[in-house]
Design a protein with these regions (language model features):
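A short glycine-rich, hydrophobically flanked beta-strand micro-motif that places a catalytic Asp/Glu
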Residues: 105, 176-188, 233-234, 329-336
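Structural element of the ATP-grasp superfamily
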Residues: 31-36
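Short, well-ordered beta-strand elements within core beta-sheets of diverse protein domains
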Residues: 78, 106, 150-151, 295-303
Length: 339
């Protein structure tokens, strides 16, 4: 989104957001300052520098999530349990950004949600609220997303609060019509605490909106460019309380050569699996270098109820396997989180 917005602005082409507004959604210190000014709850954070770590963490509670200021995705992000963890990995994380300092954010262990909204004439309308389920595979590493389930059972309860938050953010960044997504945490009795916001649609998930509700995000984006009235009509007619249920299952792996994918191929043929995509085949090498494939394998599943989707998810997560030439398991083991 950032590159598209910059190119559109330089070329004098219309776009739903200007670079100044996008910068507020890309640079984490500016984003956190925005949340503070808008009165939006967010995990406590600090700018941290290598030569002042003791002072910077004086009033912070561990564990903390350490992030580059304007990195992409989860590159360089890690969980620190002590100042020594930060000192050890400071330089490698700073290398993922154009800034020489990092962001430390107190870890929130509440339920996590991916919230898609579409702004229409300055007002946010909820497209979807999904459960974002994660697992930490190694100490010190950030939990990885293993499943996103649509819609969350808490959608009806949270949609008004989520829309209010997104409307405030849209107004601050100058977004009148277009996509705005939010990642947020929730603890009962505390409301939503926003982690991040982005002026785009979540990757590897928009298909789940279509499976659950019938709304085509691709057509909505096209209408946003060529037929704004039609885009508004689509959004205003949409309900985040989907008629059907869907989930994306995302499998991560160890580095290594792939020899046997027969298990994941068989699971891809199960009833209820709508789309199955292996990113690696026999002879390929799983890697985590920059630019590597995002997952080892991905499944989209759908069903008439959350129970049916959960059951199929458990089956796939329990049986999926990718082996190396010596018969060793390459997949990191996953299981759906219980709520």
């Amino acid at each position: 989104a950032e590159c598209m917005i910059d190119i559109a602005d330089a070329a004098g082409l219309p776009s739903y957001l200007k670079p100044k507004g996008e910068k507020l959604l890309r640079e984490k210190p500016l984003m956190k300052q925005m949340f503070q000014e808008l009165g939006i709850a967010s995990p406590r954070y600090k700018k941290i520098r290598l030569d002042t770590l003791e002072e910077d963490f004086a009033d912070m509670a561990f564990p903390c999530v350490i992030k580059p200021v304007n990195g992409y995705g989860s590159h360089g992000v890690f969980v620190a349990n002590a100042i020594e963890d930060v000192r050890e990995r400071f330089q490698s994380t700073a290398a993922q950004s154009t800034f020489d300092y990092l962001m430390a954010e107190e870890y929130n262990d509440g339920r996590e949600f991916n919230i898609m909204t579409w702004i229409v004439d300055g007002q946010a309308h909820i497209i979807s609220i999904a459960d974002r389920e994660k697992i930490a595979f190694e100490d010190g590493e950030i939990p990885q997303v293993v499943r996103c389930a649509y819609p969350s059972p808490l959608t009806a309860e949270l949609q008004d609060e989520a829309a209010s938050i997104a409307t405030k953010i849209a107004g601050y960044v100058g977004l009148e019509n277009g996509p705005l997504c939010v990642q947020a945490f929730y603890r009962e009795g505390e409301g939503l605490a926003v982690c991040e916001a982005a002026g785009r649609i979540f990757g590897y998930e928009h298909e789940l909106v279509t499976l659950g509700s019938g709304l085509s995000v691709e057509e909505l984006l096209i209408d946003c460019v060529y037929d704004q009235p039609a885009a508004k009509e689509r959004v205003l007619a949409h309900s985040p309380l989907f008629a059907n249920h869907a989930a994306g299952l995302y499998f991560h792996g160890h580095d290594g050569e792939v020899a046997d994918t027969s298990s994941i191929d068989e699971l891809g043929a199960l009833p209820g699996v709508v789309e199955y995509r292996p990113y690696y085949r026999t002879g390929d090498t799983i890697s985590h270098e920059r630019g590597a494939k995002p997952y080892v394998v991905r499944y989209y599943v759908a069903g008439p109820s959350r129970e049916s989707v959960d059951s199929l998810s458990r089956t796939i997560m329990g049986r999926a396997s990718v082996l190396d030439p010596d018969g060793n398991e390459l997949l990191l083991r996953t299981a759906p989180m219980a709520h």
